[in-house]
């Protein structure tokens, strides 16, 4: 242990013996709590990199910007690495590393120091770290153990206001990580003194039913902490785009904290209040940052009827920055597997189309109108647009797969499908909008499934999504006993957009098990779908349903 960090530990321990120096900002009876999410530029990983990250964590916890917060969430994988793993206390034991191990003889320095920092600041602190645990501590797990006798996990750790470890969650869906998964997936929650129970999950977990969606369905959790080191992917899965869409679809509070290295595809943090949208968010497009973003978060009542809207953070009022391939590294989705059509935007004119695009029996109807903005100036560049439909597995190498049914308008850097899912290379004013969309509407009839989630999926050239005030979303069953849902997603009539990258519906069917219309009649009956029901009759006509939905909507608005 270096002298510098020995003295830091001593100072924090002394301060830790005097908890409560920061005033509690929220009470159990309050309508709001105050949360902070940290966008954090990680140190280049080495055996000693954790010390620089730790200093950055402590500085943020003690900063003036964080003073009013009840809870602070730090990102995934920005503290330590496989070369500096630590044991983590079992939350059932209510261990306070700051008091029980002040000299860091069992737990690593950073765990003890952050326990003391939480105690000194009197805040709930959520961190993510690389954890080690002896294989013998989990006798029910009979899988082969590493030669050193240790499992290594990607783990969230929660300290309460006293510095006690009150919660621990280990990532279920690893993203190409050389780490262990738990023997069985964990559904983990923790209670707070301000009357909110949080669930938590990590990064790639957001695309799967367990544990994120399962905590909502089975336990009614309305608030989540979400550390991430997300690698953004065009056109459907950039960080803030995904965070906001998930929170909106589930109507929950999401505290999302992201690693911040845009040059390798990492950035994206925000606080989201369900159907009300974003309270604060950021997508960096430079070298990254170490900063906390704070918002008052309205609490959900048990009836989920609270509709108070918190004031947006002043950090939301910022100059729009147009993304380019040089400002942010983007992964690319396999859009060549979509059934797609180039949207022909004739220069110097306005236009409109009503088009249905199907892949197999899954169809999306697009009702679009635009106004031309003229030709690009010399050296200028602009995006082309495609309409696309996809019904199949989302496959990436060496990671868990999920089944999706997507409908979207998305940009391309050229006219070929191979140009889609890419940012333009030009920056600033050299990127020019070719059209303004004056009408955008997508109509789809989706089959129900045992587990599925549909959400609005949008992206602007600032790499931030549209807000709920800018669009209309409806999702309903045509009859009570049907097994399909009619979805309409449209730009509000008062809105016109010229900086759009993506406008679509993301249909996440997870493992696609027990999806209506998929499998044999015996399998459908086993899943609870009754033969000869109105749902089955509706399925037979679902190719025409999107056209009917949009025709009715157009008639009502005219």
UniProtKB/Swiss-Prot annotation:
What switches on its expression? Induced by ethanol.
Ranges that cross the membrane: none
InterPro entries on file: Biotinidase-like_euk, Biotinidase/VNN, C-N_Hydrolase, C-N_Hydrolase_sf, Vanin_C
Keywords tagged on the record: Cell membrane, Glycoprotein, GPI-anchor, Hydrolase, Lipoprotein, Membrane, Signal
Q: Where in the cell is it found?
A: Cell membrane
* GO MF term list: hydrolase activity; pantetheine hydrolase activity
Membrane topology term reads: Lipid-anchor; GPI-anchor
Q: Which cellular component, as a GO term, is one annotated location?
A: extrinsic component of membrane
Q: Its family?
A: Belongs to the carbon-nitrogen hydrolase superfamily. BTD/VNN family.
* Protein name, as recorded: Vanin-like protein 1
Organism equals Drosophila melanogaster
- Protein encoded by which gene: vanin-like
């Amino acid at each position: 242990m270096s002298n510098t960090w020995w003295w830091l530990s001593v100072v924090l321990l002394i301060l830790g013996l005097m908890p409560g120096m920061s005033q509690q900002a929220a009470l159990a009876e309050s309508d709001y709590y105050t949360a902070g999410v940290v966008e954090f530029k990680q140190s280049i990983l080495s055996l000693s990199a954790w010390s620089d990250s730790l200093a950055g964590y402590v500085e943020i916890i003690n900063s003036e910007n964080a003073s009013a917060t009840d809870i602070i969430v730090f990102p995934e994988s920005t503290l330590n690495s496989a070369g500096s793993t630590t044991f983590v206390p079992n939350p059932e034991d209510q261990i306070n590393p700051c008091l029980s191990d002040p000299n860091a003889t069992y737990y690593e320095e950073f765990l003890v120091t952050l326990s003391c920092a939480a105690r000194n600041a009197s805040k709930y602190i959520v961190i993510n770290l690389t954890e080690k645990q002896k294989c013998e501590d989990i006798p029910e797990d009979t899988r082969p153990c590493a030669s050193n006798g240790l499992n290594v996990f990607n783990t969230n750790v929660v300290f309460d206001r006293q510095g006690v470890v009150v919660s621990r969650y280990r990532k279920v869906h690893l993203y190409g990580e050389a780490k262990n998964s738990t023997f069985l997936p964990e559904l983990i929650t923790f209670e707070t003194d301000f009357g909110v129970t949080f669930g938590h999950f990590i990064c790639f977990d957001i695309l799967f039913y367990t544990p994120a969606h399962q905590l909502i369905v089975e336990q009614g959790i309305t608030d989540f902490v979400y550390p991430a080191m997300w690698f953004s992917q065009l056109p459907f899965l950039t960080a803030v785009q995904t965070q906001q869409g998930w929170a909106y679809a589930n109507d929950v509070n999401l505290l999302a904290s992201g690693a911040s290295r845009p040059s390798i595809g990492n950035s994206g943090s925000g606080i989201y209040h369900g159907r009300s949208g974003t309270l604060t968010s950021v997508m960096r497009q430079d070298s990254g940052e170490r900063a906390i973003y704070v918002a008052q978060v309205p609490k959900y009542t048990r009836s989920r009827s609270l509709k108070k809207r918190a004031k947006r953070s002043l950090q939301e009022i910022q100059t729009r920055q147009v993304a380019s391939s040089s400002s942010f590294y983007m992964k690319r989705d396999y859009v060549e597997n979509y059934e797609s059509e180039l949207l022909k935007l004739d220069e110097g004119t306005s236009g409109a189309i009503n088009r249905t695009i199907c892949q197999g029996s899954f169809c999306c109807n697009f009702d679009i109108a635009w106004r031309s903005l003229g030709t690009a100036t010399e050296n200028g560049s602009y995006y082309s647009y495609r309409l696309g439909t996809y019904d199949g597995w989302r496959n990436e190498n060496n990671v868990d797969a999920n089944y999706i049914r997507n409908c979207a308008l998305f940009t391309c850097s050229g006219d070929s499908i191979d140009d889609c899912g890419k940012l333009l290379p030009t920056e600033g004013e050299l990127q020019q909008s070719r059209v303004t969309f004056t009408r955008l509407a997508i109509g789809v009839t989706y089959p129900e499934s045992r587990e599925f989630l549909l959400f609005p999926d949008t992206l602007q050239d600032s790499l931030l999504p549209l807000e709920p005030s800018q669009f209309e979303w409806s999702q309903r069953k045509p009859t009570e006993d049907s097994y399909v849902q009619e979805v309409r997603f449209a730009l509000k009539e008062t809105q016109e957009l010229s900086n759009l990258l993506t406008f679509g519906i993301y249909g996440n069917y997870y493992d696609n098990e027990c999806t209506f219309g998929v499998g044999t009649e015996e399998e459908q009956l086993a899943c609870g779908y009754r033969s000869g029901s109105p749902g089955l009759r509706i399925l037979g006509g679902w190719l025409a349903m999107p056209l009917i939905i949009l025709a009715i909507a157009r008639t009502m608005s005219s």
